[in-house]
Amino acid sequence: MRVDRAREAALDALAACRRNGAWIDGALKQVLKRDGLSGRDAAFASRIAYGVMQSRIYLDRCLARCLTQRPEKLEPLLLDILRIGAYQIFLMDKVPVNAAVNEAVEMAKAHKLSRAAGLVNAVLRNVDRKRGEPLAFADEFEALSVQTSHPRALVERMVGLLGAEEAEAFLRADNEPVPTTIQTNTLKTTAKQLRASLEDESVTVEPHPWLADCFTVSGTGDLEGLRAWREGWFTVQDAAAKLTALAAAPKAGSFVIDTCAAPGGKSFAMAMCMEGKGHILSCDMEEHKLRLMEAGAERLGIECMEVRLADGRVCDEALAEKADVVVCDVPCSGLGIIRKKPDIRYKDMASLAGLPAIQSAILDNASRY
């Protein structure tokens, strides 16, 4: 039996995160491109990869009661296969249990884990049988940690900050589906033309409820395979990023400094507000991110944007009091975008301690421009 390509792509993306410390969005993007997956296959692979990353703690607890050893003691690849199977059983109603189990068994065989194929079959069948049995928890923190798949340290932090009721709502919201929002590149096309092009390729398109020239889209896991993407007719952008440009309201001919610009979305939105006229200086500390921004600007036909390697904490005296608009999307914990980047929840909370000082230094410096 041939292994399903979409499930295999999800497994490869999860393995890249585990081995290389990659983020799931970037890892998945590379795998989909490598394997030439698009449309429903890409969407299915994305659902599984994001879902397993998002629900890992819950899945491991469900697997643990069907194993004779702790899940983390298993070979990592085998554990990922079990997680993929369990995710489909618990959280993908449209996937038949037999299909989820059989595909997991075939993946184990394909990766030379033949001896484990029987284990995969037995464990996932047992997982299905025990679906209706409640899990046991030591206290309310553990219950919330497992039920929402957030590390206990993060649960305790959020309860301390928000109180139990609001923290639970916050953590559960992290697991809600993420709408994909795109902005029409008004430098190249119109919202009407963009929508028609997307619908011609069977993408489901809905106007954004309160942002002009923006849409929410679904029905494809690989936006970069679309004609409209190749033509530079749109960019993927959260509503919050678009609102930043609208609030700043740069005019045609403005000089804008974007101090922490990568991956470039806010700079792109500013360029569209400015009708492509003026000068946007988009800065970042990592050279490979500059190349990504340059490629994005080229695809979108943005010629008023200059990228520069720069530390936002260090003032360029030549720019003092020269800017009409300064944008500072300072480095942050990312806890507010876990819904979009589920792997952030597994960050070590201690690593966040130095962020306020960095943020303050960047803002102090930017105020001089």
Language model features: what each stretch is:
Residues 1-369:
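S-adenosylmethionine
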